[in-house]
């Protein structure tokens, strides 16, 4: 925020001294202002100062003029609008802003208490009236603010400054921001309304525009405005040296050494457009780069130097140099001492370095995702500063260790057993596990052998009659004096049945050694730890679980690929069989076709025969019908003949 404020307000300062004031001949008004300021200096309480109508008119004539009202420590700005009555002061918690003045033009302003710090109080901001005549000469002439005014005005200004210095103050005057920010986002955060400065506008500083001096302070005058005597500089286009209290052509050179350290903004003359105003930033300044420009006035004499203490650096300004070489000497005495690190904490420090590096990458990724590159860069700067400090501390610590401990473990000597372990990925199967298992087996076997010897010495019964229990429960052996001896649990696999002869101990040790030497090991991957052992090409339980499953899969695949029929058939037989099969197929097809044709012929013949038979039957039926008809006709004729004969007889 401070960087945006200072960079954004640099252009306002570049046009700070380009104002044309219309009240250069108002000597009466100036005298009235001086009288009012004398009254203020005689009292220690804050009073409300009034300005004449002429001064108000002069203020209102400048449209881009900012006026700061000191009544009840409130800020007000007017853009050609009459000033409001003085607001009331709140209960030491903030300032009551009038809705028609500054708060209406500057929304969302942050209210603060009367003190920026516990030991710093906000000074009274006076009513701003320009009673000076700034003659910006392009011909290398000095711009003395009060050069055209009466000498009485200069004397009054000097008296006012002396009275201000003699007034009792409980604490040094704090830092007050000089100008509000100009909102030119998003196209450019540094240009004012996207309009470049005119060619006739001279830059008051001997440096590039858009930059502001980090320790630039304006003197506070008690004459109802700003004492611009501390800025009697050469404002010209030929880049002359700007020295406070050194290049003035008037007789006021010795009267400008006033110990005024508070900052009050001057009137700002921008171009024809009205800027958009952001809230004032009341945060104290931080460490900024050194830029040549007008600086604060020195105390008491021109040969003395002023030191402005910030958070990290203490710059000193040489006000009396004619070449305007403002040198800022940084005191490194306040830097904390580096604590050396012990050789045992080197590993932890390197882990911190690794974490800091990864955090930088994470922060850059977050800024790329969110698009907030400004805040992301600030976070990366903080992390990088801690990283560089850690590296410097490690460098000094390692150099000290090299000098004092030449055989330290930071060199990673292989002979040193207590060296810092290397952070590497552990292997899947460690040999240390095998060693630990062998050691456990040796210990168990030794315990079993000792228990057997104790039982042989203490028991009256033979060893064959002593109870042998399983591996899950301990064995209880009775002694001759009636006490019970609890032996360690004996594994059934490591304690075979012993004979009653004297060679039982030797046989048990030989068997145990043989079983220890026969630790299972996978013939494929070489591992000695597996939840289950499987069959392999070397025999049963020769492969670990994973290798055995893969081997079984391969065996099944080979069996499916290498299947052969029971009767071995040659290639010729297979070819001949194929030919025979083809021939048989063709013959079968022919036979089926012939059979089908014959069958069709038979069916056709049968159909023809049936048709012939039907025709014959029909013919026979017709013949029979004709015969019957003929017979019937003959009978009728005979009857008729008989009747005729009978008639003839009668």
UniProtKB/Swiss-Prot annotation:
Gene Ontology MF, one: transcription cis-regulatory region binding
Composition bias, Polar residues: 116-129, 261-272
UniProt-recorded name of the protein: GATA zinc finger domain-containing protein 11
GO terms of biological process kind: regulation of transcription by RNA polymerase II
Domain of life: Eukaryota
InterPro entries (alphabetical): Znf_GATA (IPR000679), Znf_NHR/GATA (IPR013088)
CDD domains: ZnF_GATA (cd00202)
Record GO cellular component, one term: nucleus
Zn finger spans (GATA-type): 522-547
Residues forming coiled coils: none
Metal-binding recorded as keyword: yes
Biased composition (Basic residues): 425-434
Keywords associated with the record: Metal-binding, Transcription, Transcription regulation, Zinc, Zinc-finger
Bias (Low complexity) ranges: 16-79, 130-180, 221-260, 273-334, 442-511
PROSITE patterns, A to Z: GATA_ZN_FINGER_1, GATA_ZN_FINGER_2
Sequence segments annotated as region (Disordered): 16-96, 111-181, 221-335, 409-515, 619-650
Gene name linked to the record: gtaK
Purpose: Transcription factor that regulates morphogenetic cell movement during development.
Keyword Hydrolase listed: no
């Amino acid at each position: 925020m401070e960087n945006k404020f200072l960079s954004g307000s640099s252009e306002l300062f570049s046009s700070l001294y380009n104002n044309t004031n219309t009240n250069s001949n108002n000597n009466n008004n100036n005298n009235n202002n001086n009288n009012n300021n004398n009254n203020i200096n005689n009292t220690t309480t804050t009073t409300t100062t009034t300005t004449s109508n002429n001064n108000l008119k002069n203020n209102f004539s400048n449209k881009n003029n900012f006026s700061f009202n000191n009544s009840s420590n409130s800020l007000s700005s007017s853009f050609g609008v009459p000033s409001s009555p003085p607001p009331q002061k709140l209960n030491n918690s903030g300032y009551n802003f009038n809705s028609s003045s500054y708060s209406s033009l500057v929304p969302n302003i942050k209210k603060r208490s009367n003190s920026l710090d516990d030991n710093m109080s906000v000074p009274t901001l006076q009513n701003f009236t320009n009673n000076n005549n700034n003659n910006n000469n392009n011909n290398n002439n000095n711009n003395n603010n009060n050069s055209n005014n009466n000498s009485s005005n200069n004397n009054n200004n000097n008296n006012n400054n002396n009275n201000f210095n003699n007034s009792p103050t409980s604490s040094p005057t704090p830092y007050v921001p000089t100008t509000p920010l100009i909102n030119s986002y998003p196209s450019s955060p540094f240009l004012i309304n996207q309009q470049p400065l005119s060619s006739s506008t001279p830059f008051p500083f001997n440096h590039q525009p858009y930059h502001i001096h980090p320790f630039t302070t304006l003197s506070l005058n008690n004459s109802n405005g700003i004492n611009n005597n501390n800025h009697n500089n050469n404002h010209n286009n030929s880049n002359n040296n700007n020295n406070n209290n050194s290049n003035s052509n008037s007789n006021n050179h010795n009267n400008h050494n006033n110990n005024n350290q508070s900052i009050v903004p001057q009137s700002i003359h921008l171009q024809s457009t009205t800027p958009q105003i952001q809230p004032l930033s009341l945060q104290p300044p931080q460490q900024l780069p050194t830029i040549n420009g007008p600086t604060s006035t020195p105390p008491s004499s021109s040969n003395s130097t002023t030191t402005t203490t910030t958070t990290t650096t203490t710059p000193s300004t040489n006000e009396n140099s004619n070449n305007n070489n403002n040198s800022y000497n940084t005191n490194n005495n306040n830097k904390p001492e580096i604590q050396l690190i012990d050789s045992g904490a080197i590993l932890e420090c390197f882990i911190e370095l690794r974490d800091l590096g990864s955090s930088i990458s994470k922060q850059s990724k977050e800024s790329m995702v969110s698009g907030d590159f400004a805040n992301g860069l600030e976070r990366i700067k903080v992390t990088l500063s801690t990283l560089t400090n850690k590296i410097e501390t490690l460098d000094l610590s390692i150099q000290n260790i090299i000098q004092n401990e030449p055989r330290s473990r930071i060199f990673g000597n292989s002979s040193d057993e207590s060296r810092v372990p290397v952070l590497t990925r552990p292997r899947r199967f460690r040999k240390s596990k095998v060693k630990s298992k062998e050691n456990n087996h040796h210990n168990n076997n030794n315990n079993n052998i000792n228990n057997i010897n104790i039982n042989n010495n203490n028991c009256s019964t033979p060893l064959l009659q002593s109870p042998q229990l399983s591996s899950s429960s301990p064995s209880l052996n009775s002694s001759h004096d009636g006490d019970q001896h609890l032996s360690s649990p004996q594994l059934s696999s490591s304690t075979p049945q012993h004979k009653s002869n004297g060679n039982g101990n030797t046989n048990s040790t030989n068997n145990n050694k043989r079983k220890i030497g026969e630790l299972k090991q996978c013939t494929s991957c070489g591992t000695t730890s597996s939840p289950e052992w499987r069959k392999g090409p070397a025999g049963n339980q020769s492969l670990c679980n994973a290798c055995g499953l893969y081997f079984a899969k391969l065996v099944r695949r080979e069996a499916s690929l290498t299947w052969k029929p029971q009767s071995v058939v040659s290639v010729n037989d297979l070819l001949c069989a194929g030919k025979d099969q083809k021939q048989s197929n063709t013959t079968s097809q022919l036979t089926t076709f012939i059979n089908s044709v014959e069958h069709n012929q038979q069916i056709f013949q049968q159909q023809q025969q049936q048709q012939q038979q039907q025709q014959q039957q029909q013919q026979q039926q017709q013949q029979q019908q004709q015969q019957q008809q003929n017979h019937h006709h003959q009978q009728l004729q005979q009857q008729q003949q008989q009747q005729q004969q009978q008639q003839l007889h009668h």
